[in-house]
Amino acid sequence: MKKVCFSFVIMVIALIAAGCGAEDTGTSEDGEGLKIVTSFSILGDVLENIAGERSSVTYIVPIGEEPHEYEPVPSDFQAVSDADVFYVNGLGLEEWLQRLVENTSDVDVVEVSPTIDALPLEESDGLDPHAWLDVKNVMKYVEVIRDDLVERDPDGAEIYVANAEAYLQDLQELEEWIHDQVTTIPEEQRTIVISENAYRYFGEAYGFDTVGIWELNSHEEGTPGQISRVVDIVKELDLPAVFVETTVNKSFMTTVSNDSGVDIAGEVYTDAVGLEGSGAETYIDMMKHNVDTFVSGLSQ
């Protein structure tokens, strides 16, 4: 689908960029701060905590969709072209979107992950992009974003630095809370089984093994052989629970649950925060929800 529509989108976006590329967007609509656009909701929340009321923040990928599968529409590129800066996770998450923006707009594209010790994919070339599932990595994101915002908008430096300091403290408290919570799970039951093996950063940070039906961005997802392998692992480890993601088709993990006789303990958030009313509307609340779900399911 991406290959089919690529040329068409390029032509549309080129027209959009030509219409607005000569105009310097400068600051946000109120004459202060910056117009900030980012790729997905988790980064949007992080940026809002740092930018505060000084700058406006919007994100492209709707909640509930996966950033690496999202098909941008022309209005998305219009928003990016009108922005002062476009922040992306990097590590291959938004690679093709990033290339399109760089080829059709003068807006600066900034990766927030250059200081991350990235994990390589296990079954293919490339890097695992889900670094935000380790809170310490998000703290590194905050430092990169803070420094970049201060450089772009020196008049707002005091606001950005103060907001980042407060948010870093909140993240440190979250990090300590997670470590406290996972100690309640018996060590032999600290294995997270999920559809897409996206929790490797979380596992390395907090002492879990992780198992996915498929690896990230796999062209073969949910094959009988993949499902059978995971069912065997669940039975062999005598795990009390498996889990599903909010942005992934649940039918595959339902099959694993049925074939292994092990219940699905709940949904976790991987590539997006929760919708309003979910209790997981922010990155911090999302992580707390995930940890509570893992602890409840694996402590049985």
Curated annotation (Swiss-Prot):
Record membrane topology: Lipid-anchor
Principal cellular location given in the protein's record: membrane
Superkingdom, natural source: Bacteria
Lipid group attachment sites (N-palmitoyl cysteine): 20
GO cellular component, one term: plasma membrane
Residues spanning the signal sequence: 1-19
Keywords associated with the record: Cell membrane, Lipoprotein, Manganese, Membrane, Metal-binding, Palmitate, Signal, Transport
Compartment(s) of residence: Cell membrane
Database matches in Pfam families: ZnuA
Family matches, as PROSITE patterns: PROKAR_LIPOPROTEIN (PS51257)
Any GO BP annotation: cell adhesion
Classification via Gene3D superfamilies: Nitrogenase molybdenum iron protein domain
Residues covalently joined to lipid (S-diacylglycerol cysteine): 20
InterPro entries according to UniProt: AdhesinB, Bact_metal-bind_prot9, Lipoprotein_PsaA-like, ZnuA-like
GO MF terms, alphabetically ordered: metal ion binding
Function: Probably part of ATP-binding cassette (ABC) transport system MntABCD involved in manganese import. Binds manganese and delivers it to the membrane permease for translocation into the cytoplasm.
Family of this protein: Belongs to the bacterial solute-binding protein 9 family.
Name listed for the protein in its UniProt record: Manganese-binding lipoprotein MntA
Lineage: Bacteria, Bacillati, Bacillota, Bacilli, Bacillales
Name of the gene encoding the protein in the UniProt record: mntA
